Amino acid sequence: VLLYLPGVVGIWFFVYLCNAWAFQILVNTSDHDKHLSFAHAFKLTVSGFAFSYTTPFGSGGAPYRVMELSRYIGTPRAVSSVALYSMMHVFSHFFLWTTALLAFVIAHFDVMTAWLWTLFAIFLTVFVAAAVFFSYSYKHGIIARLFRLLFFVPLLRRPARRFYERHATAFDTIDANIRFLYEHPRQLWGSLAAEYLGRLLNSFEFYFILLA
Protein backbone atom coordinates (compact mmCIF):
# COMPACT_ATOMS: atom_id res chain seq x y z
CA VAL A 1 0.00 0.00 0.00
CA LEU A 2 2.75 2.45 0.98
CA LEU A 3 4.42 1.83 -2.38
CA TYR A 4 1.57 3.57 -4.20
CA LEU A 5 0.83 6.26 -1.60
CA PRO A 6 3.22 8.82 -3.16
CA GLY A 7 1.47 8.32 -6.48
CA VAL A 8 -2.01 8.74 -4.96
CA VAL A 9 -1.02 11.95 -3.21
CA GLY A 10 1.52 13.29 -5.68
CA ILE A 11 -0.74 13.06 -8.73
CA TRP A 12 -2.81 15.90 -7.29
CA PHE A 13 0.07 18.32 -7.74
CA PHE A 14 -0.07 17.78 -11.50
CA VAL A 15 -3.88 17.87 -11.49
CA TYR A 16 -3.82 21.26 -9.78
CA LEU A 17 -1.23 22.50 -12.26
CA CYS A 18 -3.67 21.73 -15.08
CA ASN A 19 -6.57 23.30 -13.17
CA ALA A 20 -4.55 26.45 -12.55
CA TRP A 21 -3.54 26.61 -16.21
CA ALA A 22 -7.19 26.40 -17.31
CA PHE A 23 -8.21 29.02 -14.75
CA GLN A 24 -5.43 31.38 -15.80
CA ILE A 25 -6.47 31.14 -19.46
CA LEU A 26 -10.07 32.03 -18.61
CA VAL A 27 -9.19 34.95 -16.35
CA ASN A 28 -6.73 36.44 -18.84
CA THR A 29 -9.13 36.05 -21.78
CA SER A 30 -11.06 39.23 -21.12
CA ASP A 31 -11.05 42.90 -21.99
CA HIS A 32 -9.36 43.97 -18.75
CA ASP A 33 -5.71 45.03 -18.70
CA LYS A 34 -4.68 42.81 -15.78
CA HIS A 35 -2.63 39.65 -16.22
CA LEU A 36 -3.08 36.85 -13.70
CA SER A 37 0.23 35.09 -13.14
CA PHE A 38 0.37 31.31 -13.08
CA ALA A 39 1.59 31.35 -9.48
CA HIS A 40 -1.42 33.43 -8.43
CA ALA A 41 -3.78 31.18 -10.40
CA PHE A 42 -2.23 28.10 -8.76
CA LYS A 43 -2.69 29.60 -5.29
CA LEU A 44 -6.35 30.41 -5.95
CA THR A 45 -6.91 26.96 -7.45
CA VAL A 46 -5.47 24.97 -4.55
CA SER A 47 -7.00 27.13 -1.82
CA GLY A 48 -10.33 27.24 -3.69
CA PHE A 49 -10.56 23.47 -3.90
CA ALA A 50 -9.54 23.25 -0.23
CA PHE A 51 -12.53 25.46 0.66
CA SER A 52 -14.77 23.33 -1.56
CA TYR A 53 -13.69 20.10 0.14
CA THR A 54 -14.23 21.50 3.65
CA THR A 55 -17.58 23.25 3.20
CA PRO A 56 -21.07 21.71 2.84
CA PHE A 57 -21.93 20.70 -0.74
CA GLY A 58 -18.56 22.06 -1.88
CA SER A 59 -20.01 25.56 -1.78
CA GLY A 60 -17.05 27.50 -0.42
CA GLY A 61 -14.56 27.39 -3.28
CA ALA A 62 -16.31 29.59 -5.83
CA PRO A 63 -17.21 32.47 -3.45
CA TYR A 64 -13.64 32.45 -2.15
CA ARG A 65 -12.20 32.70 -5.67
CA VAL A 66 -14.60 35.53 -6.51
CA MET A 67 -13.69 37.41 -3.35
CA GLU A 68 -9.95 37.10 -3.93
CA LEU A 69 -10.11 37.72 -7.67
CA SER A 70 -12.43 40.74 -7.36
CA ARG A 71 -9.64 42.70 -5.69
CA TYR A 72 -7.61 42.16 -8.83
CA ILE A 73 -10.03 42.52 -11.77
CA GLY A 74 -13.29 43.74 -10.20
CA THR A 75 -16.34 41.82 -9.03
CA PRO A 76 -18.24 41.39 -12.36
CA ARG A 77 -15.20 40.00 -14.17
CA ALA A 78 -14.29 37.85 -11.17
CA VAL A 79 -17.79 36.34 -11.09
CA SER A 80 -17.75 35.65 -14.84
CA SER A 81 -14.27 34.08 -14.68
CA VAL A 82 -15.19 31.80 -11.78
CA ALA A 83 -18.51 30.87 -13.42
CA LEU A 84 -16.70 30.07 -16.67
CA TYR A 85 -14.19 27.91 -14.85
CA SER A 86 -16.92 26.03 -12.96
CA MET A 87 -18.71 25.32 -16.24
CA MET A 88 -15.46 24.22 -17.88
CA HIS A 89 -14.65 21.98 -14.91
CA VAL A 90 -18.00 20.21 -15.23
CA PHE A 91 -17.83 20.00 -19.03
CA SER A 92 -14.40 18.36 -18.89
CA HIS A 93 -15.92 15.51 -16.89
CA PHE A 94 -18.26 14.73 -19.79
CA PHE A 95 -15.25 14.46 -22.10
CA LEU A 96 -13.48 12.16 -19.65
CA TRP A 97 -16.53 9.89 -19.32
CA THR A 98 -16.91 9.79 -23.10
CA THR A 99 -13.25 8.84 -23.45
CA ALA A 100 -13.71 6.05 -20.91
CA LEU A 101 -16.78 4.70 -22.71
CA LEU A 102 -15.08 4.79 -26.11
CA ALA A 103 -12.05 3.00 -24.65
CA PHE A 104 -14.35 0.36 -23.14
CA VAL A 105 -16.19 -0.18 -26.44
CA ILE A 106 -12.92 -0.50 -28.37
CA ALA A 107 -11.35 -2.86 -25.83
CA HIS A 108 -14.45 -5.01 -25.30
CA PHE A 109 -16.28 -4.70 -28.60
CA ASP A 110 -16.79 -8.47 -28.81
CA VAL A 111 -18.74 -8.57 -25.53
CA MET A 112 -20.98 -5.58 -26.21
CA THR A 113 -24.64 -6.51 -25.78
CA ALA A 114 -27.82 -4.75 -26.82
CA TRP A 115 -28.20 -3.53 -23.25
CA LEU A 116 -24.70 -2.02 -23.21
CA TRP A 117 -25.23 -0.41 -26.62
CA THR A 118 -28.45 1.13 -25.29
CA LEU A 119 -26.65 2.58 -22.27
CA PHE A 120 -23.91 3.86 -24.56
CA ALA A 121 -26.47 5.56 -26.81
CA ILE A 122 -28.20 7.14 -23.80
CA PHE A 123 -24.92 8.58 -22.55
CA LEU A 124 -24.01 9.93 -25.99
CA THR A 125 -27.40 11.65 -26.10
CA VAL A 126 -26.74 13.22 -22.70
CA PHE A 127 -23.25 14.25 -23.84
CA VAL A 128 -24.58 15.94 -26.97
CA ALA A 129 -27.26 17.71 -24.91
CA ALA A 130 -24.60 18.91 -22.46
CA ALA A 131 -22.40 20.12 -25.32
CA VAL A 132 -25.32 22.08 -26.78
CA PHE A 133 -26.16 23.55 -23.38
CA PHE A 134 -22.60 24.68 -22.66
CA SER A 135 -22.18 26.04 -26.18
CA TYR A 136 -25.39 28.05 -25.84
CA SER A 137 -24.32 29.27 -22.40
CA TYR A 138 -20.96 30.49 -23.67
CA LYS A 139 -22.48 32.10 -26.74
CA HIS A 140 -25.34 33.96 -25.06
CA GLY A 141 -24.37 34.14 -21.38
CA ILE A 142 -26.27 32.29 -18.71
CA ILE A 143 -25.83 33.95 -15.31
CA ALA A 144 -28.76 36.36 -15.70
CA ARG A 145 -31.01 33.62 -17.10
CA LEU A 146 -30.22 31.28 -14.23
CA PHE A 147 -30.81 33.99 -11.64
CA ARG A 148 -34.18 34.90 -13.17
CA LEU A 149 -35.34 31.36 -12.42
CA LEU A 150 -35.63 32.53 -8.82
CA PHE A 151 -38.50 34.76 -9.95
CA PHE A 152 -40.65 31.62 -10.05
CA VAL A 153 -39.70 30.34 -6.58
CA PRO A 154 -42.20 31.18 -3.81
CA LEU A 155 -40.82 33.40 -1.03
CA LEU A 156 -37.79 34.22 -3.17
CA ARG A 157 -39.37 35.84 -6.19
CA ARG A 158 -39.76 39.34 -4.71
CA PRO A 159 -36.32 39.71 -3.09
CA ALA A 160 -34.73 38.07 -6.14
CA ARG A 161 -36.46 40.50 -8.49
CA ARG A 162 -35.42 43.49 -6.37
CA PHE A 163 -31.83 42.25 -6.26
CA TYR A 164 -31.79 41.70 -10.02
CA GLU A 165 -33.18 45.16 -10.73
CA ARG A 166 -30.55 46.79 -8.50
CA HIS A 167 -27.70 44.85 -10.11
CA ALA A 168 -28.92 44.51 -13.70
CA THR A 169 -25.82 46.22 -15.06
CA ALA A 170 -23.54 43.83 -13.19
CA PHE A 171 -25.45 40.82 -14.54
CA ASP A 172 -25.12 42.19 -18.08
CA THR A 173 -21.39 42.71 -17.58
CA ILE A 174 -20.91 39.17 -16.29
CA ASP A 175 -22.73 37.65 -19.27
CA ALA A 176 -20.85 39.94 -21.66
CA ASN A 177 -17.57 38.59 -20.28
CA ILE A 178 -18.82 35.04 -20.81
CA ARG A 179 -19.76 35.84 -24.40
CA PHE A 180 -16.33 37.41 -24.87
CA LEU A 181 -14.69 34.02 -24.31
CA TYR A 182 -16.93 32.40 -26.92
CA GLU A 183 -15.50 34.86 -29.43
CA HIS A 184 -12.00 33.53 -28.66
CA PRO A 185 -12.22 29.79 -29.48
CA ARG A 186 -8.48 29.24 -29.14
CA GLN A 187 -8.57 30.18 -25.46
CA LEU A 188 -11.87 28.36 -24.98
CA TRP A 189 -10.52 25.07 -26.31
CA GLY A 190 -7.17 25.62 -24.61
CA SER A 191 -8.86 25.90 -21.23
CA LEU A 192 -10.97 22.82 -21.93
CA ALA A 193 -7.86 20.86 -22.99
CA ALA A 194 -6.07 21.81 -19.76
CA GLU A 195 -9.07 20.74 -17.66
CA TYR A 196 -9.42 17.52 -19.65
CA LEU A 197 -5.75 16.71 -19.09
CA GLY A 198 -6.30 17.31 -15.39
CA ARG A 199 -9.21 14.87 -15.39
CA LEU A 200 -7.11 12.23 -17.16
CA LEU A 201 -4.31 12.63 -14.62
CA ASN A 202 -6.82 12.50 -11.79
CA SER A 203 -7.99 9.07 -12.96
CA PHE A 204 -4.53 7.71 -12.11
CA GLU A 205 -5.35 8.26 -8.44
CA PHE A 206 -7.97 5.51 -8.67
CA TYR A 207 -5.59 3.36 -10.71
CA PHE A 208 -2.93 3.56 -7.99
CA ILE A 209 -5.54 2.82 -5.32
CA LEU A 210 -6.65 -0.30 -7.20
CA LEU A 211 -3.04 -1.44 -7.55
CA ALA A 212 -2.52 -0.97 -3.83
Mark where each language-model region is.
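Transmembrane helix-loop-helix hairpins in multi-pass inner-membrane proteins
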Residues: 1, 48-158
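Predominantly cytoplasmic-facing regulatory/coupling regions of multi-pass membrane proteins
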Residues: 1-46, 113-212
